[in-house]
Amino acid sequence: MSYQPHYFQEVRKAQQESYSPYSQFKVGAYLKTKDGRTFYGTNVENASYPLSICAERAILVSAISQGYRPGDFESITVTVDADKPSSPCGACRQVLKELCDDDMPVYMTNHKGDMVMMTVAELLPFGFSGKDLE
């Protein structure tokens, strides 16, 4: 699946819903499933920072809560208001590894429309998964 220009407009819509009163770092996420459904997510901060949730995890949890399962996802697009695209944090990379195919594209954009694409495996090389627990 290749990046589609409308992904940028969609992810920017999600970003506007960010609840980030402490950092003012608004993150939006747009998830496309293999059956064509779309989900929107955003970061939600908490005064106790560790309790905050990132847009990437919020969107994946939403999709799982609505019946989707690991491997059902086609791509995720994430955007930030920064000079360059920002990559998912370590916790989000681990959740992507758990719920998404290794070759799933992760499109990272910024407010200018710059885009970088990496696969889940590229974002978390030598990632830990359930297979490691067998």
Where are these regions (language model features)?
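Short beta-strand scaffold segments in enzyme catalytic cores
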Residues: 24-33, 107
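Compact, glycine-rich, soluble single-domain proteins
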Residues: 43-58
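Amphipathic coiled-coil signal-relay and dimerization helices
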Residues: 39-42, 117
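A generic structural signal for short beta-strands and their flanking turns/coil linkers
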Residues: 25-27, 40, 72-74
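C-terminal binding/interaction regions
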Residues: 2-20, 71-134
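Short, solvent-exposed cationic patches
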Residues: 54-74
